[in-house]
Amino acid sequence: MKFLSARDFQPVAFLGLMLLTATAFPTSQVRRGDFTEDTTHNRPVYTTSQVGGLITYVLREILEMRKELCNGNSDCMNSDDALSENNLKLPEIQRNDGCFQTGYNQEICLLKICSGLLEFRFYLEFVKNNLQDNKKDKARVIQSNTETLVHIFKQEIKDSYKIVLPTPTSNALLMEKLESQKEWLRTKTIQLILKALEEFLKVTMRSTRQT
């Protein structure tokens, strides 16, 4: 990955990444091609291993929140009821997005990852707004570190103008629809959003190992 400086990150997200840096693999164990050196600035480097560590950290936070919301009930965690109730089309990485071993294309894959994570930004805001106060901090951590991942991956995209950005109008209409749900359905929707983000990040992590 490219060199990134401390000022590029939100405080919480940067702290998480710095903690990962302390336990990252030694440079001698990093594969050739894991990052591009920028000799014009004396900035810290974040390798594929470290980015994978950040994704793992976010996945752990998501799983913990899902377990809390479902009280550890496996049926609750695996339910997709809210998907059919709302006709939600949450971001997902498909075979033709260039992120899988067969047909891998780094540029196309990174565009999909960034576009998808930016779309999740809206859904994570809904999640945070509808959680109890004692769970909002964890939601903010997930939000902040997801933003960090967007920033990191965006630096690797040649044509960043091709990133698909959600429109404010469509977001506003969808937010109104989601907020109008009954409380029990809002809770299921939160669970579904977290589950979808979890799967999205798992595919993202596997794709980072392709390079």
Curated annotation (Swiss-Prot):
Predominant subcellular localization, coarse grouping: secreted
Signal peptide: 1-24
Keyword check for Magnesium: no
PROSITE patterns on file: INTERLEUKIN_6
Record PTM Phosphoserine, positions in chain: 79
UniProt entry tagged with the keyword Cell membrane: no
Disulfide bond sites: 70-76, 99-109
Classification via SUPFAM superfamilies: 4-helical cytokines
GO biological process, one term: positive regulation of DNA-templated transcription
Keywords for this protein: Acute phase, Cytokine, Disulfide bond, Growth factor, Phosphoprotein, Secreted, Signal
Location relative to the cell: Secreted
Gene Ontology molecular function: cytokine activity; growth factor activity; identical protein binding; interleukin-6 receptor binding; signaling receptor binding
Gene induction: In pancreatic islets, secretion is stimulated by IL1B. In islets from Zucker diabetic fatty (ZDF) rats, but not lean animals, secretion is also increased by endocannabinoid anandamide/AEA.
Cited InterPro entries: 4_helix_cytokine-like_core (IPR009079), IL-6-like (IPR003574), IL-6/GCSF/MGF (IPR030474), IL6/GCSF/MGF_CS (IPR030473)
Source domain of life: Eukaryota
SMART domains noted in UniProt: IL6
GO CC annotation, single: interleukin-6 receptor complex
Role played: Cytokine with a wide variety of biological functions in immunity, tissue regeneration, and metabolism. Binds to IL6R, then the complex associates to the signaling subunit IL6ST/gp130 to trigger the intracellular IL6-signaling pathway. The interaction with the membrane-bound IL6R and IL6ST stimulates 'classic signaling', whereas the binding of IL6 and soluble IL6R to IL6ST stimulates 'trans-signaling'. Alternatively, 'cluster signaling' occurs when membrane-bound IL6:IL6R complexes on transmitter cells activate IL6ST receptors on neighboring receiver cells.
Recorded family membership: Belongs to the IL-6 superfamily.
Record-linked PANTHER family: INTERLEUKIN-6 (PTHR48494:SF1)
Assembly and oligomerization: Component of a hexamer of two molecules each of IL6, IL6R and IL6ST; first binds to IL6R to associate with the signaling subunit IL6ST. Interacts with IL6R (via the N-terminal ectodomain); this interaction may be affected by IL6R-binding with SORL1, hence decreasing IL6 cis signaling. Interacts with SORL1 (via the N-terminal ectodomain); this interaction leads to IL6 internalization and lysosomal degradation. May form a trimeric complex with the soluble SORL1 ectodomain and soluble IL6R receptor; this interaction might stabilize circulating IL6, hence promoting IL6 trans signaling.
Protein name, UniProt field: Interleukin-6
The species this protein was found in: Rattus norvegicus (Rat)
Gene behind this protein: Il6
